[in-house]
Amino acid sequence: MAFPERFSNLPEYAFPRLRALLDHHPAGGVPVAMTIGEPRHEMPPFLAEVLNANIAGFAKYPSNEGIPALLAAIQGWIARRYDVALGQEQIMVLNGTREGLYNAAVALCPERKAGAAPVVLMPNPFYQAYAVGALALGVQAEYVPARRDTGYLPQYGQLPPEMLDRVAIAYLCSPANPQGAVADAAYWRDLIALAERHDFQIFADECYSEIYRDTPPPGVLQIAREMGAHPERVLSFHSLSKRSNLPGLRSGFVAGGPESIRRIRQLRAYAGAPLPEPLQLVEAA
């Protein structure tokens, strides 16, 4: 039987490899948890009441569009956090951001760019969902170093112009995991200007946006609005896993241009599953 080769070089997922390394630690001493980065605080206590009150919702199929109460809650949060007003057609509820980061590439990456195979940019180190989306599409994944000498963020603008013309998507995680670097407003402006010049989309993985000490980090939506960028230029991905101590809920959202959101939603209607309504009500709360 023939099997595809496009995932042949995909390594085992990071967490099983990490478990294999940590399972053989020597006896004695105080163990330090270095496995998956789960929150160490309790989930908000009122959420159990919301879930229990709406448990009957598991008996029906959820809407692919998302319930109005949740879409309105996301609208309100984006307006308060980033001073950006979005319509509900610019928001999509996700089963965690990993779903969205992968599906967005599948739904939005063109077959050709500048007469050649498209390029998908991502920082190195990177979240595996970025790479597997590029591999699934058969496009060129370009891993751009995010080291001390680059400020722990990828310097996409230093790539050759002929490569940048082929770029369809550039992923960026800010605040970055695992480096902890934060893209400031100047970095976002430079990246958005680069995307405008070479006509590619920015997928901003902002799952850690609410983890900071003093000043909230700027977001791609607010900088794109200030610059008057093309409405489809950026997508912003968010999650409740870290900010609300709810990694098991698998709940997040993506926000951006209405045509991009329509295409991602259309793909999931065929190849995915929306978040169950009781869990959407928990997220809205």
Residue positions per predicted region:
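Residue-level marker for buried hydrophobic side chains located in beta-strands
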Residues: 202-203
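N-terminal small-domain helix-loop-helix segment of the aminotransferase-like
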Residues: 4-103
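PLP-dependent aminotransferase class I/II
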Residues: 233-285
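Helix C-cap/helix->beta junction micro-motif
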Residues: 25-28, 137, 197-198
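Conserved core of the PLP fold type I
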Residues: 59-193, 210-211, 215-228, 235
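Walker B catalytic acidic pair
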Residues: 206
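Glycine-rich "substrate-gating" loop/helix at the edge of Rossmann-like oxidoreductase active sites
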Residues: 4-9, 179-181, 241-242, 269-272
